């Protein structure tokens, strides 16, 4: 198998297969701790719109993992939200509204967590990291981070944080294995879905973990891909 890493582009030929991989990965991770109402929202249309929006976001960097030329996973890095560097205030942040697959939805976060870690503008957040379940457990997720995090260091960034569902123990184990340590928790009022005159509240417990870039690189230093995979450089397109 051939592996390459490229930037996410606003092309359906790239986004369509990636949305399908994203959906399979998210459903596998979430089915045990998401409500049926919330899981029903995450159809392919949701992931298509989310990835299309990412491809247009000038303040994020999205690196796509391609296997035999087909997008199979990605990682997204962004500047940390402003409220991470402000005193705890309990105010609503990151409000988002819209129509999705015929449903009206809203998403918001109540910012009420303590900060034991000092965060600055040299900190990035790992917004998402997903890999098609068909290709998991081969070291590919770690490989994607190994190849992209050094580029962040070259740009002058020092720290990383990541958010994940607090009940997702597999995610926590993975992140701890690459140097992240939980330092805070909060809640997302993940979606408010209005359907048939009802409002359904889907609340998620969110864990937040931190590492320095140097610590992450040191933690991943000896981690290698399964020998099943053969590494090649990207021949066409822009490498990450």
Q: Which residues does each PLM region occupy?
A:
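Conserved acetyl-CoA-binding loop-helix of GNAT-fold acetyltransferases
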Residues: 128-131, 137-150, 177
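Short hydrophobic/aromatic beta-strand element in the GNAT-like acyltransferase core
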Residues: 59-64, 74, 123, 128, ...
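Conserved acyl-donor/pantetheine-binding loop and adjacent beta-alpha core of acyl/acetyltransferases
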Residues: 81-124, 190-194
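Conserved active-site alpha-helix within GNAT-family acetyltransferase domains
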Residues: 142, 154, 166-184, 189
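Conserved N-terminal entry element of GNAT/NAT acetyltransferase domains
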Residues: 1-28, 32-33, 215-240
């Amino acid at each position: 198998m051939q592996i390459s890493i490229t930037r996410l582009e606003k092309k359906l030929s790239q986004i369509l297969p990636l949305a399908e991989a994203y959906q399979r990965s998210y459903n596998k991770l979430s089915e045990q701790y998401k409500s049926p109402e919330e899981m029903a929202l995450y159809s392919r249309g949701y992931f298509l719109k989310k990835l299309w929006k990412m491809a247009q976001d000038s303040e994020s960097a999205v690196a796509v993992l391609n296997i035999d030329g087909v997008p199979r996973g990605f990682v997204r890095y962004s500047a940390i939200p402003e409220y991470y560097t402000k005193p705890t205030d309990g105010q609503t942040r990151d409000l988002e509204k819209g129509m999705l697959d015929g449903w009206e939805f809203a998403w918001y976060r109540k910012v009420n967590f303590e900060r034991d870690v000092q965060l600055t503008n040299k900190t990035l957040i790992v917004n998402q990291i997903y890999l098609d379940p068909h290709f998991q457990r081969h070291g590919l997720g770690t490989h994607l981070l190994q190849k992209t995090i050094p580029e962040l260091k070259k740009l002058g960034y020092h720290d990383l944080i990541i958010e994940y569902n607090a009940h997702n123990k597999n995610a926590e184990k993975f992140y701890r294995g690459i140097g992240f340590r939980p330092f805070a928790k909060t809640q997302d009022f993940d979606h408010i879905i209005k359907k048939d005159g009802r409002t359904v509240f889907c609340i998620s417990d969110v864990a937040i973990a931190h590492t320095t870039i140097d610590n992450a690189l040191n933690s991943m230093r000896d981690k290698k891909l399964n020998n099943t995979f053969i590494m090649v450089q990207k021949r066409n397109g822009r490498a990450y």
